[in-house]
Swiss-Prot record:
This is Nicotinate N-methyltransferase 1. It comes from Glycine max (Soybean). Gene3D superfamilies: Vaccinia Virus protein VP39 (3.40.50.150), Winged helix-like DNA-binding domain superfamily/Winged helix DNA-binding domain (1.10.10.10). Keywords: Methyltransferase, S-adenosyl-L-methionine, Transferase. One of its GO terms (molecular function) is O-methyltransferase activity. The keyword Transferase applies. GO terms for biological process: biosynthetic process; methylation; nicotinate metabolic process. Involved in nicotinate detoxification in planta. Catalyzes the conversion of nicotinate to N-methylnicotinate, which is a detoxified form of endogenous nicotinate in planta. S-adenosyl-L-methionine binds at D222. The gene is NANMT1. It catalyses: nicotinate + S-adenosyl-L-methionine = N-methylnicotinate + S-adenosyl-L-homocysteine. It is an enzyme of class 2 (transferase). InterPro entries: COMT-like, O_MeTrfase_dom, Plant_O-MeTrfase_dimerisation, SAM-dependent_MTases_sf, WH-like_DNA-bd_sf, WH_DNA-bd_sf. Its EC number is 2.1.1.7.
């Protein structure tokens, strides 16, 4: 019996390493169906009727041509990852969207997670991945910089099409999360002046002010070249500057996905500047990915750890996703005596640091 179990374990191990070695097929197949706009083609205004690859193809390529068999191969593989439902009848395979697949459907605002997928798989980012090991050998330069000659954010500014895609990607991810945050977190009660650090075009600040009309003034604070393109929003003032030098004063400061791309010392510096800008009792409200303590095999843990490696590879080799305890220590180091975490989403957590 022991020998049989050992043989089966070896078979399972070989199967597992084969899956890991071929796993690049998953994001590349996902990228392909996004580029082809498969989700919108199936969704068709909410119909989501099961369709064969041969039926989907003309919706993707109205002028004709294409290969339905190769499209089916992509759909079938992604069905095994829960992106599509596969309906098998009389030897014919048809596909509809799962809840995961529906996140790729363009909504009435032109948003979806599709841009997030595309942003992650641009050529400049893909060039960095074969160099991930260099982050272990020498963390002073990110794999992205090694592959492209300069850090990611500087590279984006020189390539407007990449920067525009990143902004659309962040909007597609931000809007559903902010909705969840506004439903599950009430920490904006009593705030009259709110500063959004790294607020980009001000979308999140606009949503917060619409939900909490008692906030009389919003400050959208970002780099000068970013806020220069920001649209006018009622009760919002766009302010350009550098968060490492100063942060505008407010009753509360909001930031999302800022701390994860900076080192511990840099985070401490940013948070100390927030501390200076807040009155006694004021709050820094940060939305960040928070790692679990245990490295289990759940979807949540894997998604968070994968995001951590993405940060290490593309943005900062020593920037990182952190555990709740690591954020608690940052709070102490930056002078915030009170810290609370609110789990309103499976990926992002609302962190409240009170002065």
């Amino acid at each position: 019996m022991e020998k049989e179990e050992s043989t089966e374990q070896r078979k399972q191990a070989r199967l597992a390493i084969m899956e890991l070695a071929n796993m690049i097929s998953v994001p590349m197949a996902l990228n392909a169906v996004v580029r082809l706009n498969v989700a919108d083609a199936i969704w068709q205004g909410g119909a989501n009727n099961p369709l064969s690859a041969a039926e989907i193809l003309p919706r993707l390529l109205p002028a004709g041509g294409g290969d339905a068999e190769n499209l089916q191969r992509l759909l079938r593989m992604l069905a095994s990852y829960g992106v599509f439902y596969e309906h098998l009848s009389a030897g014919e395979r048809k596909y509809s969207l799962t809840d995961v697949g529906k996140t790729l459907v363009t909504d009435e605002q032109g948003l979806s997670y599709a841009h997030y997928v595309l942003q992650h798989h641009q050529d400049a980012l893909m060039r960095a991945w074969p160099m991930v090991h260099e982050a272990v050998v020498d963390p002073t330069k990110e794999p992205f910089e090694r592959a492209n000659g300069e850090p990611a954010y500087g590279y984006y500014l020189k390539h407007p099409e990449m920067n525009d895609l990143m902004v659309r990607a962040m909007s597609g991810v931000s809007v559903p999360f902010i909705r969840a945050m506004l439903e599950g977190y009430d920490g904006f009660q009593g705030v009259e002046k709110l500063v959004d650090v790294g607020g980009s075009g001000g979308d999140c600040l606009r949503m917060i002010l619409e939900k909490h009309p008692t906030i009389k003034e919003g400050i959208n604070f970002d780099l000068p070249e970013v806020v220069a393109k920001a649209p006018q929003i009622p009760f919002v003032t766009h302010v350009g500057g550098d968060m490492f030098k100063f942060i505008p004063q407010g009753d509360a400061i909001f930031m999302k996905w800022v701390l994860t791309t900076w080192t511990d010392e840099e985070c401490k510096h940013i948070m100390q500047n927030c501390h200076k800008a807040l009155p006694e009792g004021g709050k820094l409200i940060a939305c960040e990915p928070v790692l679990p303590e245990d490295s289990d095999e759940s979807h949540r843990t894997r998604a968070l750890l994968e995001g951590d490696i993405f940060v290490m590879t593309i943005y900062r080799a020593k920037g990182k996703h952190r555990t709740e305890e690591q954020f608690r220590q940052l709070a102490i180091d930056a002078g915030f005596p009170r810290f609370r975490a609110f789990h309103v989403d499976h990926f992002y957590t609302v962190l409240e640091f009170q002065k």
